């Protein structure tokens, strides 16, 4: 079950220039975004742990994105 709501993802695709978006396209984009977010979050958690913290910060996310 998807964690991200479909409507905002549909709006993002339309904001990128699409006039029409199929439900399958939105579902696939949600899947891709969730997979990417989980990957980044896991890296950020490891960075926080390595720094001796339990709290993930915005800097951890930025660093995870640059890896």
From Swiss-Prot:
Q: Which InterPro entries match?
A: Archaeal_histone_HMF (IPR050947), CBFA_NFYB_domain (IPR003958), Histone-fold (IPR009072), HmfB-like (IPR050004)
- Keywords of this protein's UniProt record, alphabetized? Chromosome, Cytoplasm, DNA-binding
Which GO terms fall under molecular function for this chain's record?
DNA binding; protein heterodimerization activity
Top-level taxon of the source organism: Archaea
Q: Which PANTHER family match?
A: ARCHAEAL HISTONE A (PTHR47828:SF1)
Question: Assembly and partners?
Answer: Homodimer or heterodimer with another histone. Dimers then assemble into higher oligomers, with the DNA wrapped around the protein core.
Q: What is this protein called?
A: Probable archaeal histone A1-2
Protein's organism: Archaeoglobus fulgidus (strain ATCC 49558 / DSM 4304 / JCM 9628 / NBRC 100126 / VC-16)
